[in-house]
UniProtKB/Swiss-Prot annotation:
Native organism: Rhizobium etli (strain ATCC 51251 / DSM 11541 / JCM 21823 / NBRC 15573 / CFN 42)
Swiss-Prot/TrEMBL catalytic activity: (S)-dihydroorotate + H2O = N-carbamoyl-L-aspartate + H(+)
Record PANTHER family: DIHYDROOROTASE
List of residues binding Zn(2+) 2: 99, 136, 174
Biological processes annotated in GO: 'de novo' pyrimidine nucleobase biosynthetic process; 'de novo' UMP biosynthetic process
Superkingdom, natural source: Bacteria
Subunit field text: Homodimer.
Bound cofactor: record note: Binds 2 Zn(2+) ions per subunit.
PROSITE patterns registered for this protein in UniProt: DIHYDROOROTASE_1, DIHYDROOROTASE_2
Name used for this protein in its record: Dihydroorotase
Example GO molecular function: dihydroorotase activity
Gene name, Swiss-Prot/TrEMBL: pyrC
């Protein structure tokens, strides 16, 4: 039986939600991942250090007995965010990063930033203290095609910001385009990118061919095949500027299967099996550890995990549940549309 053992991975972009959904999904992450950067777009959002502290306590309370997992908390950047509160949260060790959502870019982002100038005092303080900014890299102006949002964001928001504050450390989250990959590669320091599991596997055909398939709809939306291949090449390259951020985003089925469905794909339960499949296809299993376990901690100034996991290739496909049942309703699990043969187990 073929197997590989790697350091226990981390997830550098995760939605856990709250309440019954949090309680229903957290084990799928904490079973495999040691740490995760937790997204702050709750209702209401996590905008202060006190909010983050309370949310972290709810996450830890929901952990199953025996699971060792560290939630890395973020703040939701608004035009009213206090630089002093951000600095205090970072100094306490509670706040790992601040998240920029352009208003209206994704789920629960209506309270995000509309005028970047109003957020500059916080961003200047973050640059000074070395606190990373995580960005949802899309513009939301109505005259921009949804498939062009990332490219326009780079040109009109991200690049001007980085020129103005070159000391600011920026994570371009869930990169979806070849242009985004090229922009990160060309950058001179202080820029890295997370890549999701699902964007390595699906292109936009998955959403639209054969009928509307809401469980493949996410934001940023999946792009053309050439972009998917560029993401794959970056992920398997070993380049330390690229690392795993699943953007696993649970929604109960009625919020996905409706006339105006929510964006988000739930991948926490089968991400490592999917990634092993992708890296094997690309002849790069030896670089899976870098992408999932090493590059992210290095970027965020943390040590890699000492624990290991083993992925073993099974003769028969590994069976994952089609849905996760939560107290709020069922959440559909990402279907990669190919059999998965890699199974995760803990290792000494």
């Amino acid at each position: 039986m073929q197997s590989i053992t790697i350091r226990r991975p981390d997830d550098w972009h995760l939605h856990l939600r709250d309440g019954a959904i949090l309680e229903g999904v957290i084990a799928d992450t904490s079973r495999t991942f040691a740490r995760a950067i937790i997204m702050p777009n709750l209702v209401p959002p996590v905008v202060t250090t006190a909010d983050a502290k309370a949310y972290r306590e709810r996450i830890l309370k929901a952990l199953p007995d025996g699971h060792r997992f560290q939630p890395l908390m973020t703040l939701y950047l608004t035009e009213q965010t206090s630089p002093d509160d951000v600095e205090a949260g970072a100094a306490s060790g509670l706040i790992t990063a601040v998240k920029l959502y352009p208003a209206g870019a994704t789920t629960n982002s209506h309270g995000g930033v509309r005028d970047m100038e109003k957020a500059m005092p916080v961003l200047e303080r973050m640059a000074k203290i070395g606190l990373p900014l995580c960005v949802h890299g899309e513009v939301t102006t109505p005259d921009v095609d949804i498939f062009d949002r990332e490219a326009v964001f780079i040109d009109t928001v991200l690049d001007p910001l980085r020129r103005r504050l070159p000391e600011l450390k920026v994570t371009m989250e869930h990169v979806t385009t070849a242009g985004g990959i090229d922009y990160i590669k060309a950058a001179q320091g202080n820029l890295a990118g997370s890549i999701t599991t699902h964007h390595l596997i699906i292109n936009r055909n998955a959403i639209l061919v054969g009928g509307i398939r809401p469980h493949y709809y996410c934001l940023p939306v999946a792009k053309r095949e050439n972009h998917r291949l560029a993401l794959r090449a970056a992920a398997v390259s070993g380049d330390p500027r690229f690392f795993l951020g699943t953007d696993s985003a649970p929604h109960v089925d009625p919020l996905k299967e409706c006339a105006c469905g929510c964006a988000g794909i739930y991948t926490s339960i089968n991400t490592m099996s999917c990634l092993a499949h992708v890296f094997e296809e690309e002849g790069a299993l030896d670089r899976l550890e870098a992408f999932a376990s090493l590059n992210g901690p290095a970027w965020y100034g943390l040590s890699p995990n000492e624990e290991r996991i083993t992925l073993s290739k099974q003769a028969d496909p590994v069976v994952f549940p089609a849905k996760i049942e939560t107290g709020a309703g069922a959440v559909t699990v990402f279907d990669p549309m190919v059999p998965l043969h890699w199974q995760v187990s803990a290792s000494a």
